[in-house]
From Swiss-Prot:
Predominant location category: secreted
Encoding gene, per UniProt annotation: prtG
Propeptide boundaries: 1-14
Protein name stated in the entry: Serralysin G
Residues annotated as binding Ca(2+) 7: G378, G380, D382, D408
Hemolysin-type calcium-binding repeat residue intervals: 340-357, 358-375
NCBIfam families named among the record's database cross-references: Zn_serralysin
Length: 475
């Protein structure tokens, strides 16, 4: 999977010392994957990981029937005799109120991303997906070791059922930010046809990360994984809804839900998403999610955090938010248009949409990418980065709303790898020229770049409220 598709190699642009370009370049390539090995394991593209997690080719519509929606029912079992329990487990306990509530939220999170609907079965109706607890091992002893198990779609009695060890406290109270919610979502994934990313199982003895098929088999990339995200550089203690590879996998099986959050949705602080895992209520709330969003003009609002953050609006990439690493991502195919940073020193990278990016307080680095972006640095010494001419075309220019001379800088060093970019009063037609034109009526500087030597400038940025000078520009 090509995540970036840039035409400019920025690695050498930052070689002469610190520039904002260096930070942008690092974030572009943060957790890039699918190119060679990481350690002794191959790195998988999104498509390879998706196919690995769906390698059983099982759906509720039949074997190898992909992309077709499914209307499923669920129920909470009320009683099961020991002789009738699956895999010879014993000691049935029905779901408590907390489990029922959290299960409905977990089901909802799967329905958000794929064309599966869930409705509670009527009394006496055999549900597609059934939930129950167990407490005893097959030999009748108290089970203090296992966590849970679930069965794939099928046509036998316990196909599509999920079972949880009631002796585990986090299964009894599977709240958000607790492992029990992760377990619920994981087991529901099995009932929908998702496999572990590798050929391992808790019943296989003592499997470990050494047994993975590919390097990204951790909970950073898939809630179906057994392995801690620390193996791949994350540090956020697991998802509570589908992760990037899971979203791609479940959408392969049932199709993408294109009616999910088609309005203007805010994720993070001031969230209107209606989902607990997308919502931060205070600076101590960890945000751990991979967002699927089908439309609208949407915003990442991470304004309540004081830690330095790295926020990427590029589909398929990860962000460091709220002091944790790689715990927010955007699922492939989803578009988030806007970002608001916090009071730390943030790096924010936009995408090809018309982005609104607000760095907040702190010394921030902002990069809008393509589109007619509106960039606000906020308080602090900010750097506005441009990497190639399509970042701010003269036909669709960016606007920097609050440039402060002597504090902020504009970084054009990516254009100047040959050290031939020069400031002039008027274009000569030779190319690689910059004109700074102060417009007293609009109270803004128009920064024009003429790279090709043609009659029309290739690049324009409008800088509000500042009579820009060459010393304000990093070349």
């Amino acid at each position: 999977m090509a995540l970036y598709g840039k035409k400019t190699d920025l690695s050498s642009a930052s070689s002469g010392g610190y520039t904002g370009v260096a930070d942008v370049y690092q974030l572009w390539h943060y957790h890039a994957r699918g190119n060679g090995n990481i350690g002794d394991k191959p790195s998988y593209t999104l498509e390879q990981a998706r196919d690995q997690i769906t390698r059983g080719n099982i759906t509720w519509n039949g074997e190898k029937v992909f992309g077709k929606s499914a209307a499923l029912t669920y129920s909470f079992l009320q009683s099961v005799a020991d002789s009738d329990m699956p895999d010879n487990f014993k000691g049935f306990v029905k779901f408590n109120a907390a489990q029922i509530q959290q299960t409905k939220l977990a089901l909802q999170s799967w329905a958000d991303v794929a064309n599966v609907t869930f409705s509670e079965a009527k009394d006496g109706e055999r549900a597609t997906i059934q939930f129950g607890n167990y407490t005893l091992t097959p030999d009748g002893n108290t089970d203090n070791n296992s966590q849970a198990f679930g069965f794939y779609p099928g046509n036998w009695k316990w196909a599509g059922s999920a079972w949880f060890n009631y002796n585990q406290a986090d299964n009894q109270r599977p709240d958000i930010n607790e492992f029990g919610r992760n377990t619920l979502t994981h087991e529901i994934g099995h009932t929908l046809g998702l496999y572990h990313p590798g050929d391992y199982d808790a019943s296989d003895g003592n499997p470990g990360y050494k047994d993975v098929t590919y390097a990204e088999d951790t909970r950073q990339f898939s809630i179906m994984s057994y392995w801690n995200e620390g193996y791949t550089g994350g540090d956020f203690h697991g998802y509570h809804a589908a992760a990037p590879h899971d979203i791609a996998a479940i959408q392969k099986l049932y199709g993408a839900n294109m009616s999910t959050r088609t309005g203007d949705t805010v994720y993070g602080f001031h969230s209107n998403s209606g989902r607990d895992f997308y919502t931060a209520t205070d600076s101590k709330t960890p945000l751990i999610f991979s967002v699927w969003d089908a439309g609208g003009n949407d915003t990442f609002d991470f304004s309540g955090y004081s830690a330095n953050q790295r926020i990427s609006l590029i589909s398929g990439t990860f962000s460091d938010v709220g002091g944790l690493k790689a715990m927010v991502s955007i699922a492939a195919g989803a578009v988030i248009e806007n970002a608001i940073g916090g009071s730390g020193h943030d790096v924010i990278v936009g995408n090809l949409s018309d982005n609104r990016i607000d760095g907040g307080a702190g010394n921030d680095v902002l990069y809008g990418d393509g589109g007619a972006d509106i960039l606000t640095g906020g308080a602090g010494k900010d750097i506005f980065v441009y990497a190639w001419e399509k970042d701010s075309l003269s036909s669709a220019p960016d606007t920097i709303t609050d440039f402060q001379r002597g504090e902020d800088r504009i970084d054009l060093s990516a254009f100047n790898k040959n050290h031939d970019l020069r400031f002039v009063d008027n274009f000569s037609g030779k190319g690689n020229e910059v004109v700074l034109n102060w417009d007293s009526q609009s109270h803004q500087t128009n920064m024009w770049l003429h790279l090709s030597g043609h009659e029309t400038a290739d690049f324009l940025v409008n800088i509000v409220g500042a009579a820009l000078q060459p010393s304000d520009v990093i070349v």
